[in-house]
Regions:
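Sensor-1/coupling segment of RecA-like P-loop NTPase cores
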Residues: 45-52, 137-164
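Mid-core helix/loop region of P-loop NTP-binding domains shared across ATPases and GTPases
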Residues: 2-11, 80-87, 94-144, 180-188, ...
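Phosphate-binding P-loop
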Residues: 36-43, 111
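Walker A/P-loop nucleotide-binding motif
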Residues: 40-62, 76
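Residue-level preference for the first positions of well-ordered beta-strands
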Residues: 45-47, 69-70, 115-117, 144
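C-terminal alpha-helical "lid" subdomain
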Residues: 1-27, 31-34, 55-61, 165-166, ...
Length: 246
């Protein structure tokens, strides 16, 4: 791809890697840390929801990285209640070849003894019975539990009827996250490269409100600029955005 030079200049970029950039505190990460602390200290059931790509998982892992009493489980579409219990037991060092009842009792005792806070990420994949089991774990252990996922997680809990209608009322604290702010985007861009105001603005315009897309876009733009042996320009950023699967 041949790119003509424009006036936005960059003195140099940092080495390109496929790992995440250094953690940058954002408005959403501050909210996540605050909710996590309240859930941990007050032993509540909490919920955090937000669209994909805004840094939920990254912030949760950063929070847990600094503590020994946090267990994060990432749910997926295979997470039946049994799979969830086995996954928690595996992380707690509990034998998983036992009956479901014995595994449940084992994790209850281990969590109480260790005073573990449990975080379930991508919790929109959990069936309602799985969420009810988390409620039961909370009742039995007195430990804080946080579920985090896409906006439909909260909508699904609010719409529960019949035997599960009470679950939503058990949530003691929560937050709905917004798209990253312009300040957040600028800080992330500048953690990855030397960038002036106009360059940051261009990345903000093309990031579609997603930190995940933003990080990919910055890396792609730097690579394209290096291939063409020129600074990152608005045109390069726009062309690089077209190459991303948005």
């Amino acid at each position: 791809m041949k790119i003509k030079d424009e006036s936005i200049k960059m003195s140099r970029s940092k080495p390109i890697t496929d790992t995440d950039p250094d953690f940058i505190e954002t408005k959403n990460s501050k909210t996540i840390f605050e909710i996590c602390e309240m859930v941990r200290i007050e032993k509540e059931i909490g919920i955090i929801t937000g669209r994909a790509g805004i840094g939920k998982t990254y912030s949760l892992k950063e929070y847990a990285r600094h503590r020994q009493d946090i267990l994060i489980i990432e749910a997926d579409i295979t997470f039946t209640p049994k799979v969830m219990i086995k996954e928690i037991c595996t992380h707690l060092g509990i034998i998983t070849g036992l009956s479901l009842h014995d595994m449940f009792e084992g994790l209850v005792e281990k969590m109480k003894t260790m005073d573990i806070m449990l975080i379930i990420d991508e919790a929109e994949h959990l069936p309602v019975r799985g969420i009810d089991i988390l409620r039961r774990i909370h009742d039995r252990t007195g430990c804080g539990i946080l579920i985090c996922g896409l906006p439909q997680l909260l909508m699904r809990l609010k719409s529960l009827r019949g035997d599960y209608a009470y679950i939503f009322s058990r949530i003691g604290i929560g937050a709905r996250l917004d798209a990253p702010t312009k300040k957040d985007v600028y800080a992330i861009v500048r953690s990855m490269m030397d960038a002036d105001e106009k360059t940051c603005e261009s990345f903000y315009e093309h990031s579609a409100g997603s930190i995940r897309i933003l990080v990919k876009l910055v890396r792609r733009s730097i690579r394209v600029a290096q291939i063409n042996q020129m600074p990152v320009t608005r045109e390069i950023i726009a062309e690089s955005a077209k190459l991303l699967t948005l």
